[in-house]
Amino acid sequence: LVDLPKPSVDTGMGLERIAAVMQGVSSNYDIDLFKKLINAIKSQSRKGEESHYRVIADHIRSSAFLIMDGVTPDNEGRGYVLRRIIRRALRHGYDLKIESPFFYKLVDVLTEEMGQTYPELLNKKDYIERIILMEEERFAATLAQGMTLLQKEFDRTNAELISGEFAFKLYDTYGFPLDMTID
């Protein structure tokens, strides 16, 4: 080990935590940056657990910045990570009983909050909204198809449970979330 030329301490706080301390709030999700996003989500939904709003607010930021940097939803690599982030946010929206496309609308609120700091976010706003809306529509179609296949399997087997093999097929072949199959 060698001494640093300028000794310092890294608290590992991150920008959101520093903002929370500076704004006198106890949670990163109570800072001004998240407040408007969370309020926008609440305006589109029924009352629900705070964790749903926080996940959606966090995931719209991640999704928008990934798309801004050239990533699009895909079945592999970075695109797969983006797809999973978007779909996880959508599932939290469904838990809040939001039934129509909503996630892409949050890009507008995000660009109001962060567009000055990140001008590229403003420049690509319409593109980001389009990509997210397309993924929302694709996921809605996936869910509809999965529910149809699931119902057909229940009708065919006349059982209360489906096989693990069929559940995996729904997930692997059709992209139907395993947790929704379990429900």
Regions found by a protein language model. Give the residues of each.
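A glycine- and charged-residue-rich anion-binding loop/surface
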Residues: L1-D183
